[in-house]
Amino acid sequence: MSHAVKIYDTCIGCTQCVRACPLDVLEMVPWDGCKAGQIASSPRTEDCVGCKRCETACPTDFLSIRVYLGDETSRSMGLAY
């Protein structure tokens, strides 16, 4: 089952979320917006099972990665009208 995975620009490039994902949904890509020079990316969201291990692993105060399940996607990402 596919879930929406949102990476926020508060990502510090630490790779914790990538290492925590049991299905390799995430990867790091080059990005000049942080000191690490990389940011998490979610190219394989169709493989996401919604375990949210990536969220748990994120060390930032404001979670830099969020997994949205079903109807939660529309409400939480501001997509509901």
Swiss-Prot record:
Chaperone found in the keyword field: no
A GO-annotated cellular component: photosystem I
Residues noted as binding [4Fe-4S] cluster 2 in the record, renumbered to the chain: C21, C48, C51, C54
Protein name: Photosystem I iron-sulfur center
Cofactor(s) listed in the protein's UniProt record: [4Fe-4S] cluster
Disulphide bonds in the chain: none
Topology within the bilayer: Peripheral membrane protein
UniProt remark on cofactor binding: Binds 2 [4Fe-4S] clusters. Cluster 2 is most probably the spectroscopically characterized electron acceptor FA and cluster 1 is most probably FB.
E.C. number(s) listed in UniProt: 1.97.1.12
MF terms (GO), sorted A to Z: 4 iron, 4 sulfur cluster binding; electron transfer activity; metal ion binding; oxidoreductase activity
Source organism of this protein record: Prochlorococcus marinus (strain MIT 9301)
InterPro entries according to UniProt: 4Fe4S_Fe-S-bd (IPR017896), 4Fe4S_Fe_S_CS (IPR017900), PSI_iron-sulfur_center (IPR050157), PSI_PsaC (IPR017491)
Function of the protein: Apoprotein for the two 4Fe-4S centers FA and FB of photosystem I (PSI); essential for photochemical activity. FB is the terminal electron acceptor of PSI, donating electrons to ferredoxin. The C-terminus interacts with PsaA/B/D and helps assemble the protein into the PSI complex. Required for binding of PsaD and PsaE to PSI. PSI is a plastocyanin/cytochrome c6-ferredoxin oxidoreductase, converting photonic excitation into a charge separation, which transfers an electron from the donor P700 chlorophyll pair to the spectroscopically characterized acceptors A0, A1, FX, FA and FB in turn.
Positions of [4Fe-4S] cluster 1 binding: C11, C14, C17, C58
Subunit structure: The cyanobacterial PSI reaction center is composed of one copy each of PsaA,B,C,D,E,F,I,J,K,L,M and X, and forms trimeric complexes.
Catalytic reactions on record: reduced [plastocyanin] + hnu + oxidized [2Fe-2S]-[ferredoxin] = oxidized [plastocyanin] + reduced [2Fe-2S]-[ferredoxin]
GO BP, sorted A to Z: photosynthetic electron transport in photosystem I
Keyword tags: 4Fe-4S, Electron transport, Iron, Iron-sulfur, Membrane, Metal-binding, Oxidoreductase, Photosynthesis, Photosystem I, Repeat, Thylakoid, Transport
Gene field: psaC
Keyword Repeat tagged: yes
Limits of the 4Fe-4S ferredoxin-type domain: 2-31, 37-68
